[in-house]
Amino acid sequence: MPNFSYSDLLPLGADATKYRLVSTEGVSVVKHGDKEFLQVESAALVKLTHEAIHDINHYLRAEHLQQLTNIVKDPEASPNDRFVAIDLLKNANIAAGGVLPMCQDTGTALVMGKKGQYVLTTGKDEVAISQGIYDAYTKLNLRYSQMAPVTTWEEKNTGNNLPAQIEIYADSDHQDEYNFMFIAKGGGSANKSFLYQETKAVLNPTAFMNWLDEKLRSIGTAACPPYHLAIVIGGTSAEATVKTAKLASTKYLDSLPTTGDAATGHGFRDLELEQKVLELTRTLGIGAQFGGKYFCHDVRVVRLPRHGASLPIAIAVSCSADRQAKAKITKDGIFLEVLETDPAHFLPETTDEHLNDDVVAIDLNQPMAAVLAELSKHPVKTRLSLTGTLVVARDLAHAKIKADMDAGKPMPEYLKNYAVDYAGPAKTPEGYASGSFGPTTAGRMDSYVDYFQKNGGSMVMLAKGNRSKAVTDACKSNGGFYLGSIGGPAARLAQDCIKKVEVLDFEELGMEAVWKIDVVDFPAFIVVDDKGNDFFASTSTPLTINTRPEN
């Protein structure tokens, strides 16, 4: 008979996180018999949650900021790598002012709590945490992104960014503590969480790296690299594998053991494989969105036990808006992870002018034919500086325009006369022309492109991420262009580039309305041109699932 042996599946080491004291109110120690209990008032949970949501939308970890600085200083980084890194550092400095959030997609609020067995609370914890999320999203300049299902087919924005994902677990290792992880997860990076059901054929170094090369290329740039990449191999269930990948991408699992154990089967980090995967990402050619070396800042690889008949593998990313913070409540008070509130010292002396002299200025207020003629002179990957008027339209606006055209209405003149930016702003602070304003994922609008262009609209499109071959074919056939906008620096765009915003159509759609904006020196790159060239075509391979790799 085998011996009984137990280990936590994810045995974490000591917590080295630096915390700051938020408050001592609402926390006390009470005795029941000979036991001491930590009593936490609901108000303390509300306050902690509000503070956490504020901080993770405005501040980043110092380690993340240092990684951006390292890109700028790396002589092997491409000019486009360095440009993106500097723009993200500028964005971090603006967001740290506490007014404009770092990204316009202020995310779904995710809260994981681990409640010690000697912790007492005065109400339902999920209600108090939800109240804190509500307070943060309604009082700060954040965006409401949650869609409530009214029927199976009909949805309505909840108008307060609730509901949140809240998961609370019992914790016997920290009996008189309440520990938390707060995450603001935007749609771009959430959509790049993948589960693959593979076989043991993948479990050798050559086969795995060949398999992974293909899968990493398929991630593309829609989730705003440079990424913190997480890969989990194995798992007791598919859902456990994906959840572990999400936690690994936040660095929550960094203190895992670095070797396995045949007796208990606990998970561990493979540091050697992490380095090999990081080296692989630097050869893909994708870089920090528009070509180069820095597709990823770093990599985490976690190996988990598995059923002999199953091999789930999960891939997840945390994006350039690397938004999470740990927190804890102890007898000493309420504590929140220390994030960098003064990131100015991470900005290097390098200026935009030192990065690349080949920046092409585009006057968007010319007739569309003149804009197209100017763009046609330049190859893909060319960096642009856009000045003039853009219209902004994303998913719901495109659907409504298509429905109107199907009903016999003409293509709106604004889509014929102006370049269209796929975006949606956060709330506009008092005294600002715009709230945080950045691109959404272009691929969701791919099905409209050929039809719209054949009717004279969407000839110049601006968004983030790679697109399907159908868009490349449409642009070649119709003479159009797709320009890549940097994913991530939404606060900088709002403060420095956007001078005027007004609703143009479908006002009832809120942030998904059609907007007209005036921009100055708005950065972009040519990704797809009118000759059938696509920057991303050289960096991608067809995606296969559950295919036996070459050994």
Predicted segments, located by residue:
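Residue "hotspots" at secondary-structure boundaries inside conserved domains
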Residues: 373-376, 413
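Short, well-ordered loop/turn sites that connect or cap secondary structure elements
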Residues: 375-378, 384
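Short, structured beta-strand/loop micro-motifs enriched in basic residues and often containing a Trp
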Residues: 358-370
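Feature captures the catalytic cores and cofactor-binding loops of soluble hydro-lyases/lyases
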Residues: 255-285, 289-290, 392-522
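C-terminal binding/interaction regions
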Residues: 292-299, 306-307, 496-551
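Glycine-rich beta-strand-to-loop/alpha-helix junction loops that act as flexible
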Residues: 229-236, 387-388, 463, 487
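Non-transmembrane, aqueous-exposed alpha-helical and coiled segments at domain scale
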Residues: 1-231, 236-355, 435, 453
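Short, charged beta-turn/beta-strand-edge "cap" motif at the junction between a beta-strand
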Residues: 383, 389-393
